[in-house]
Amino acid sequence: MQSYQQPLRVGVGGPVGSGKTALLEALCKAMRDHYQIAVVTNDIYTKEDQRILTEAGALEPERIVGVETGGCPHTAIREDASMNLAAVEALARKFGNLEVIFVESGGDNLSATFSPELADLTIYVIDVAEGEKIPRKGGPGITKSDFLVINKTDLAPYVGASLEVMERDTQRMRPQRPWTFSNLKKGEGLQAVIDFIVERGMLGARA
């Protein structure tokens, strides 16, 4: 049986349209020259996110696997993560030297969490367009994720959201836990996410 190393598994969750796939695209493009990376995407009835990442050239196509969960996206990353666990293992065996596998959940609500059997680190993505109240609504995605990304800061003036209020509420809801504002269209906030993955994942910084 072919041997392989156990990669760091990073779960990326968040509501539909918050920017999970955009974050993954940016992470892959920024990290692929320094680390061996693969991605597992989750969609309920299609493999749309796999297609988006492939067409964007985030990674070589064979490094991106799409999983059709066929039901509640929450179940596929927590209660019954078997399909995702199988996809992760298949990628790890195929390449042998993977260092990071990102697992993107299907769009879900604030209660979404990853099974510890599936993800070593979790990143949760919300966006300003959902309203400034989102951080204080809480839920495991906000309070228990290892890293929180508040995306689309450029939309704040258009939706009447106060970034100051969101910052205050975020610090109150997840004291001592890291987070960042981001505008992924401009790459703002991306480095903070990378630094977190490298440091907490003990990957070792590489130029």
From Swiss-Prot:
Q: Name one GO cellular component term.
A: cytoplasm
Q: Which domain of life is it from?
A: Bacteria
Signal peptide location in the record?
none
Keywords in UniProt for this one?
Chaperone, Cytoplasm, GTP-binding, Nickel insertion, Nucleotide-binding
Function as written in the Swiss-Prot or TrEMBL entry: Facilitates the functional incorporation of the urease nickel metallocenter. This process requires GTP hydrolysis, probably effectuated by UreG.
Q: What is this protein called?
A: Urease accessory protein UreG
Assembly information from the UniProt record: Homodimer. UreD, UreF and UreG form a complex that acts as a GTP-hydrolysis-dependent molecular chaperone, activating the urease apoprotein by helping to assemble the nickel containing metallocenter of UreC. The UreE protein probably delivers the nickel.
Q: Which Pfam families match?
A: cobW (PF02492)
**Gene label:** ureG
Q: Which organism is it from?
A: Pseudomonas putida (strain ATCC 700007 / DSM 6899 / JCM 31910 / BCRC 17059 / LMG 24140 / F1)
Where does this polypeptide localize? Answer: Cytoplasm
> Could you tell me one molecular function GO term of this UniProt entry?
GTP binding
Residues holding GTP: G14, P15, V16, G17, S18, G19, K20, T21
Give the HAMAP family listed for this entry: UreG
In the record, the note on similarity to other proteins reads: Belongs to the SIMIBI class G3E GTPase family. UreG subfamily.
GO terms (BP aspect) = urea catabolic process
